[in-house]
A protein has these predicted regions:
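Periplasmic/extracellular electron-transfer cofactor-ligation site
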Residues: 33-59, 84-86, 108-113
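Electrostatic cytochrome c docking/interface patches
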Residues: 19-35, 51, 66
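Gly/Gly-Pro-rich "capping" loops immediately C-terminal to redox-active cysteine motifs
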Residues: 49-78
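Residue-level detector of conserved, well-ordered beta-strand and adjacent loop positions
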Residues: 64, 88-91
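Post-cleavage N-terminal segment of exported redox proteins
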Residues: 1-28, 108-113
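Soluble non-cytosolic domains of exported or imported proteins
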Residues: 30, 70, 93-97
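C-terminal capping alpha-helices of c-type cytochrome domains
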Residues: 79-80, 91-113
Length: 113
C-alpha cells in the first residue's frame, strides 16, 4: 500500500511539473507574440513577410527567405538587440530573455511559408 501511495505521489508530481512547463511555454509564446506585435509588426508585418507600407519602403526581407533562414539565432538576437541600418536597437527597452523569445518567435514565423 505504501509503495502504491508513493508511486501515485510521484505520478501526480510529474503531472504537475508537466502542466507547469506547458503553462510557461504558452505564456512565453503569448508574451513573444505580444512583443512582436508591439515592436516589430508595424514594419515586418503580422506574418513576418515585410510587406507593410513601411516594410516595402525599407526593402525588408521576408522572414521565410533563404537569407533570413540561414542566419543563426545568435545573429538574429544581435540584430534585435543592436539594430541594423534603419532598425532600432532594443537592448535598452527589452530584457535579454525577451529578445531571445522574439528570436524564437521570428524563427517560427519564418518557418511558415
Amino acid at each position: 500500500m505504501l509503495k502504491m501511495k508513493t508511486g501515485l505521489q510521484r505520478a501526480f508530481l510529474a503531472v504537475i511539473v508537466a502542466v507547469g512547463t506547458l503553462w510557461r511555454m504558452t505564456l512565453v509564446a503569448q508574451d513573444a507574440a505580444s512583443l512582436y506585435k508591439a515592436k516589430c509588426a508595424a514594419c515586418h508585418g503580422a506574418d513576418g513577410k515585410g510587406d507593410t507600407p513601411v516594410g516595402k519602403k525599407l526593402g525588408l526581407r521576408d522572414f521565410s527567405s533563404p537569407e533570413v533562414q540561414k542566419m543563426s539565432d545568435a545573429e538574429l538576437t544581435t540584430i534585435i538587440a543592436d539594430g541594423k541600418e534603419k532598425m532600432p536597437s532594443y537592448k535598452k527597452s527589452l530584457k535579454p530573455e525577451q529578445i531571445k523569445d522574439l528570436t524564437a518567435y521570428i524563427r517560427d514565423l519564418g518557418s511558415k511559408k
